From Swiss-Prot:
Gene3D superfamilies listed in its UniProt record: 3.30.60.80, 3.40.1360.10, 6.10.250.240, RecR Domain 1
NCBIfam families per UniProt: recR
InterPro entries: DNA_Rcmb_RecR, Rcmb_RecR, Rcmb_RecR_Znf, TOPRIM_dom, TOPRIM_RecR
Gene: recR
Superkingdom of origin: Bacteria
Record carries keyword Metal-binding: yes
Metal-binding found in the keyword field: yes
Pfam families: RecR_C (PF21175), RecR_HhH (PF21176), RecR_ZnF (PF02132), Toprim_4 (PF13662)
Protein name: Recombination protein RecR
Organism name: Chloroflexus aurantiacus (strain ATCC 29366 / DSM 635 / J-10-fl)
Length: 204
């Protein structure tokens, strides 16, 4: 008699594997490895991981100005008086902020859209933080908006829409120079390439 694999795994273990597998970039094999690693780990290590996850969900939110991640009302970048208040770099996700900051090539502010235009995925203009961006451009001393959406089809479509919305507001609109891998995400670009793209950004 053949025993099914799911009958060999205790229910709590199977559930943890299932939850890990729901995370982006985690397949069934990696989910299983992570689960069995935690089974072997000291209880304090597993508890520390669980507590860190809870702390993130309970303490971290979004900046009311730029929508980057923060533990307060405003993020560290928005609170930094040394940042150039005349520039706003528009990105898709908070991870893109981290990627750009690692280059050291940009000292302005940010605005996180939390996604990109993708009608086939049911993501439209109203689902992004676009109106909030336009409100900032109208009310803050902004002179340049850098459209640093990802260099793929969705990112280009989002940049085109933003360019149209920003045109009547009289600000300079730029985009990082060519050289970033087409079809990729900013978070995977190496700091040197990304930094060069920012320094050589082109006007739209």
């Amino acid at each position: 008699m053949t025993v099914r694999t799911d009958q060999l795994i205790a229910a709590p273990v199977a559930r943890l594997i299932e939850e890990f597998a729901k995370l982006p970039g985690i397949g069934p094999k990696t989910a299983s490895r992570l689960t069995f690693y935690l089974l072997r780990a000291e209880p304090k290590q597993a508890l520390a991981l669980a507590q860190a996850i809870l702390d993130v969900k309970e303490q971290v939110g979004y900046c009311r100005r730029c929508f980057n991640i923060t533990v307060g009302e405003l993020c560290a970048i928005c609170l930094d008086p040394s940042r150039d208040q005349t520039k706003i770099c528009v990105v898709e996700e908070p991870l893109d902020v981290l990627a750009i900051e690692r280059t050291g090539a940009y000292r302005g502010l940010y605005h996180v859209l939390h996604g990109h235009i993708a009608p086939l995925e049911g993501i439209y203009r109203e689902d992004l933080k676009i109106e909030e961006l336009l409100a900032r451009v109208r009310s803050e001393p902004v002179q340049e908006v850098i459209l640093a959406t990802n260099p793929n089809t969705e990112g280009e479509a989002t940049a085109f829409l933003l360019l149209r919305d920003l045109a009547p507001l009289g600000v300079r609109v730029t985009r990082p120079a060519r050289g970033l891998p087409t079809g990729g995400d900013l978070e995977w670009a190496d700091p040197e390439t990304l930094g060069s793209a920012f320094e050589g950004r082109r006007e739209l």
